A protein has these predicted regions:
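Canonical Rossmann dinucleotide-binding motif of NAD(H)/NADP(H)-dependent dehydrogenases/reductases
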Residues: 1-29
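The beta1-alpha1 cofactor-binding region of Rossmann-like NAD(H)/NADP(H)-dependent oxidoreductases
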Residues: 51-65
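C-terminal helical subdomain
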Residues: 163-166, 170, 174, 178-179, ...
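Catalytic loop of short-chain dehydrogenase/reductase
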Residues: 83-84, 91-104, 123-174
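Conserved glycine-rich Rossmann-like NAD(P)H-binding loop of the short-chain dehydrogenase/reductase
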Residues: 24-40
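A glycine-rich helix->loop->beta "capping" turn
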Residues: 66-79, 85, 96
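Hydrophobic positions on the long internal alpha-helix
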Residues: 78, 114-118, 122, 168-169, ...
Length: 233
């Protein structure tokens, strides 16, 4: 049975991704910072819970040790945990270095913390896959094209963190050719991150995450994908 870990899986896209992977026969670890909500989600899903705060090195290491002791390997890692950031939309000059650090600590450094801690387990896995949840707002091509809706969204910390995440994904893919690393854009999905203002459901948004988490050993690596295919970034 394939073993998967999803960060930020107690709600939204992470929860739906966990549900779909369990439905497909995976053994899933629900990673969540809040122990009560994480356990509740895991119970609802029929998953296993592991407390995991991606901004805390000790928490990440402890989670990796739990999975190592329990499963001995990891086949699928979905780095889904993320924050919207300072929410100073359109007010670039108001964004501080502290705002940037807070957003990057979850959206970029958190992914690196988790990936670093779980790399030995991924290397022991069966055709291992890592899916990093980015955003269309992380596409330089989209955000600089006046004809695209992304062009109108100016969020210095969030957008740039999602751009950085795609590059992080690319670098890991080159360094670890036996592991398929890909970034995905789930689309503008109604979640807590955007106050449920998104134009599509979590079921629709999770589609590309689940698809890329399910690729075989001959699947793509180092790419950025949405439900329509490769994304220019």
């Amino acid at each position: 049975m394939t073993t998967a870990l999803i960060t930020g899986a107690n709600k939204g896209l992470g929860f739906e991704t966990a549900r779909r992977l369990i439905e497909a026969g995976h053994a899933v670890y629900v990673g969540a910072r809040d122990a009560h909500r994480g356990r509740e989600a895991a119970t609802r899903l029929g998953a296993r819970f592991v407390q995991l705060d991606v901004t805390d090195e000790d928490s990440v290491k402890a989670a990796a040790e739990i999975v190592r002791a329990d499963a001995g390997r990891l086949d699928v890692l979905v780095n889904n945990a993320g924050i919207a950031g300072a929410r100073k939309l359109g007010r670039i000059g108001d964004v501080t270095a502290a705002d940037m650090m807070t957003t990057y600590d979850t959206n970029v450094f958190g992914v690196v913390r988790v990936t670093h801690a779980f790399l030995p387990l991924l290397e022991a896995g069966d055709a291992p896959v890592v899916v990093n949840v980015s955003s269309g707002l992380g596409s330089v091509a989209a955000t600089t094209d006046p004809s695209r809706v992304e062009f109108r969204v100016t969020a210095l910390d969030y957008n740039s963190s999602k751009t950085a995440l795609v590059m992080v994904t690319s670098q890991y893919a080159k360094a670890y050719p036996a592991i398929r690393f890909n970034a995905v854009d789930p689309g503008y999905t109604a979640t807590d991150l955007n106050g449920h203002q998104g134009t599509q459901t979590v079921e629709e948004g999770a589609e590309i995450i689940v698809r890329m988490a399910s690729i075989g050993a001959d699947g793509p690596t180092g790419g950025f994908f949405d439900k329509a295919g490769p994304v220019a970034w």
